[in-house]
């Protein structure tokens, strides 16, 4: 790192902290992305295999990974892990199947639907993460959670959740399922989450379209505490327009009682 400028050294240190990668990987990724830290971290998380210089895949024991898959595979269909296998997988990881950590693993595996992994999803996902054991996967979980601190990666994770959660063949996401997943992924990120859920249960009572799901993330990150910055003429879904109309008097009422 001696040949680098001080500003570049700072970026290398930040990159290493953020991605939990080595100095060699940090220098390689930053130099390929014009030393733009945000671009480099985003590209690293999207395609880690292009930048990781340590031979993660080379040190992977394929036979061990196959044996691990065999532990979880569906007895009736050897090409997938069914609900019982998922439960065993979660037990081995000491994780609640309904936890956000399990959802993050499903995202990293690019799983198509909840409560199962195809053999390809499991094998490719574990390989990409450089894991051939439950212990190695456990050690990766904090890094995956760290990855979600980058807004672009969280958005990818959030949008993945809609397709993962809905029933195959359905366009929308059932309301109860949508609320359950919103409580999981937007907890601590959307100040009006409880009010949003109340509004949906009282006034909507229908499935949630993909467009509404995706735009709620944008809404949650821009809306002011009193909703005064909401643009009714903007390209927001009608459901969000209706929510703002429902919520504003309640927010104003809460403020007047606390003053």
UniProtKB/Swiss-Prot annotation:
One of its GO terms (molecular function) is cullin family protein binding. Residues 8-45 form the UBA-like domain. It comes from the Eukaryota. Disruption phenotype: Reduced neddylation of Cul3 in lysates from testis. Highly expressed in testis. Also expressed in brain, heart, liver, skeletal muscle and kidney. In brain, preferentially expressed in the telencephalon ventricular and subventricular zones, albeit at low levels. In adult testis, expressed in cells above seminiferous tubules, but only weakly in spermatogonia. The record marks 115 as: Essential for interaction with UBE2M. This is DCN1-like protein 1. Residues 60-248 form the DCUN1 domain. It holds the Pfam family Cullin_binding. Part of an E3 complex for neddylation composed of cullins, RBX1, UBE2M and CAND1. Interacts (via the DCUN1 domain) with the unneddylated cullins: interacts with CUL1, CUL2, CUL3, CUL4A, CUL4B and CUL5; these interactions promote the cullin neddylation and the identity of the cullin dictates the affinity of the interaction. Binds neddylated CUL1. Interacts (via the C-terminus 50 AA) directly with RBX1. Interacts (via DCUN1 domain) with the N-terminally acetylated form of UBE2M and UBE2F. Interacts preferentially with UBE2M-NEDD8 thioester (via N-terminus 1-26 AA) than with free UBE2M. Its main location: nucleus. Keywords: Acetylation, Cytoplasm, Nucleus, Proto-oncogene, Ubl conjugation, Ubl conjugation pathway. The DCUN1 domain, also known as PONY domain, mediates the interaction with different cullins. The DCUN1 domain mediates the interaction with the N-terminally acetylated NEDD8-conjugating E2s enzyme leading to the NEDD8 transfer from N-terminally acetylated NEDD8-conjugating E2s enzyme to different cullin C-terminal domain-RBX complexes; the neddylation efficiency correlates with the DCUN1D1-cullin and DCUN1D1-E2 interaction affinities. The UBA-like domain mediates interaction with autoubiquitylated ARIH2 leading to ubiquitin ligation to DCUN1D1. The keyword Iron does not apply. Mono- and poly-ubiquitinated by ARIH2 and ARIH1. Monoubiquitination by ARIH2 is mediated by an interaction between autoubiquitinated ARIH2 and the UBA-like domain. The monoubiquitinated form preferentially interacts with non-neddylated cullins and modulates cullin RING ligase (CRL) complex composition and activity. GO terms for biological process: positive regulation of protein neddylation; regulation of protein neddylation; regulation of protein ubiquitination.
């Amino acid at each position: 790192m001696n040949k680098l400028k001080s500003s570049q050294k700072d970026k290398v240190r930040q990159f290493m902290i953020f991605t939990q990668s080595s100095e060699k990987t940090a220098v390689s990724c930053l130099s390929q992305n014009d030393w733009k830290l945000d671009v480099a971290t985003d590209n690293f998380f999207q395609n880690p295999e292009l930048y990781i210089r340590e031979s993660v895949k080379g040190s992977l024991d394929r036979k061990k990974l196959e044996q691990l898959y065999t532990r979880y595979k569906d007895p009736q269909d050897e090409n997938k892990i069914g609900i019982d296998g998922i439960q065993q997988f979660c037990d081995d990881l000491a994780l609640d199947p309904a936890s956000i950590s399990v959802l993050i693993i499903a995202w990293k595996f690019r799983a198509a639907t909840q409560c199962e992994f195809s053999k390809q999803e499991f094998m490719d996902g574990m390989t990409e993460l450089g894991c051939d054991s439950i212990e190695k996967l456990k050690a990766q979980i904090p890094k995956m959670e760290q990855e979600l601190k980058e807004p672009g990666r969280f958005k990818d994770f959030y949008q993945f959740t809609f397709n993962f959660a809905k029933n195959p063949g359905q366009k929308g996401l059932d309301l109860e399922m949508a609320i359950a997943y919103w409580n999981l992924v937007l907890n601590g990120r959307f100040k009006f989450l409880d009010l949003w859920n109340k509004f949906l249960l009282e006034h909507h009572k229908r499935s949630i379209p993909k467009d509404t799901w995706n735009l709620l993330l944008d809404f949650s990150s821009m809306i002011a505490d009193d909703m005064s910055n909401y643009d009714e003429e903007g390209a927001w879904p009608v459901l969000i327009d209706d929510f703002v109309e429902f919520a504003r008097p309640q927010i104003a009422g809460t403020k007047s009682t606390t003053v």
